Amino acid sequence: GQIALDKLGIKVDNYFASEIDKYAIQVTQKNYPNTIQVGGVEFVTKEMINHKIDLIYGGSPCQSFSRAGDGTGFYGKSKLFWEFVRVLKETKPAYFLLENVVMKKEWERVITDALGVEPIKINSSLVSAQNRNRLYWTNIPNVYQPKDKGVSLQDILFRDVDEKYYLTEKGSKYITDNTRLKKKFTALNGGKALTLMSQYNQSK
């Protein structure tokens, strides 16, 4: 978020971040040491911030909305969406932006009704080498689909890489011998990588 604001040339007087992962916090503070960390979103109050807020943006946990997740919707980790709504109501920012995965239409409608704006679906493949469809709810005016920059996976891959980053022969064989994994990890769609996925583990 702060990178985007920097690129847009938007000066920020105070930047608050709600994060609980200690490694994410370390990275943020290394790159943006003036960031004010306020802890878990469920404990954030207007009094803690004590400033006029112009913009709030975030992405509530997607695991319970994602097709690759547990499918529990607002009853799982994705219920933290309601904390985003609560903070919006308490701080009354001029603008907001929420990002999340493409999900079931009934869940999408709940978020749309709560925020009062229709989502915009943007595929990151327009500006990167990865297919990644995401929904964005925002009251920021004049948000539009970015132009396709035509970035392919071949454009961003390094050709000379230290062997320590190579898959082992055993690992390569495991992927290529498994039909499902081979399709998932080696297929290119128009020169684009499939959506990258990661496992969420809360740090201690």
For the regions a protein language model found, what residue spans apply to each?
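Class I S-adenosyl-L-methionine
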Residues: 44-55, 60-204
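Conserved SAM-binding loop
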Residues: 28
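Short, glycine/polar-rich helix-capping loops at beta-to-alpha or helix-loop-helix junctions
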Residues: 24
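Conserved SAM-binding strand-loop segment of SAM-dependent methyltransferases
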Residues: 34-40
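Conserved SAM-binding loop of SAM-dependent methyltransferases across substrates and taxa
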Residues: 1-10
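Conserved SAM/SAH-binding beta-strand->alpha-helix loop
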Residues: 21
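Short beta-strand element of Class I
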Residues: 14-16
